[in-house]
A protein has these predicted regions:
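Residues immediately within or flanking Cys/His clusters that coordinate Zn2+
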Residues: 15, 46-49
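Short cysteine-rich loop/turn motifs with clustered Cys
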Residues: 2-32, 54
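Short, solvent-exposed loop/turn segments at secondary-structure junctions
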Residues: 34-36
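Polybasic, low-complexity binding patches
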Residues: 38-47, 57-100
Length: 100
């Protein structure tokens, strides 16, 4: 399980806004259906996606997260995978610039 507070901050500020409505004020929602996890544990931070408070709460209320995302026509797992890859490239570039 990846824990990365810097990545969670990146998810909140990267400019895409809520994946459902586009609002800029977002929480980092951990996708529960992205990987197998132990009871009561969050998935790794690499599975965090931006959701406004309203949609974050609504997603948790449904209990059927995969269905909730499908209802909104969003492939949140693909988004999380791509965003985490972009973040990795971004942080690698920052580290290289610091070394120069």
């Amino acid at each position: 399980r990846i824990k990365d507070k810097k990545y969670l901050a990146y998810v909140k500020r990267n400019g895409s806004g809520c994946l459902v409505c586009g609002r800029k004020e977002v929480d980092a929602h951990h996708l529960r259906h992205a990987q197998h996890r132990g009871w009561g544990l969050k998935n790794g931070d690499q599975w965090a996606v931006p959701l406004c408070r309203e949609h974050h709460t609504d997603c948790h209320r449904t209990g059927k997260e995969a269905r909730w995302w499908a209802m909104h026509g969003i492939d949140a797992i693909a988004w999380a995978e791509m965003n985490y890859m972009v973040y990795g490239e971004y942080t690698s570039q920052e580290e290289n610039e610091e070394d120069e």
